[in-house]
Amino acid sequence: MEQKGSMLLKVVSIIMMVGGIIGAVASFIGAVLAGIASAAMAQPEVSDAVNSALAAEGYSNSTGPVMAVIWIAVVIAVAGSVVEIIAGVKGKKNWDNPAAAQTLMIFGIVCAVLSLISNILFATGGMGVQIVSILSGLVIPVLYIVGTVQLKNQA
């Protein structure tokens, strides 16, 4: 008996749901830490000390822009986690429905793009390049997209 649907899509969808939940928790922690940093930077003595340290390294008055980039990255990471959870749920539900393949493919592409943007912003904001995050943020959505192509080819 020939199997209908994409087992790859089903498995990767479950991984995406779990990853999305972990990402949401990590994003929440990131938001808390960014909030603490923002509150600390609101204190003139802290802000002056940080600006002095950055100026000594050649970065003058850059704490505001750095914090803005970090906050934007946190918002995008939260959005990415939500999209990843939704994509996982929809993929798990529709792993054997070729009519849903196009919509699922769009979810996979959006997940990959949001992950890439978030990683670029974190690196730009001084958080460093997170190779594991970049790879997992791209490999899983690419596998999800491959699963949607398998599903679409069954139509």
Residue ranges of model-derived segments:
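Membrane-embedded alpha-helical segments of small multi-pass membrane proteins
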Residues: 4-40, 63-154
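Membrane-interface interhelical connector segments
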Residues: 39-63
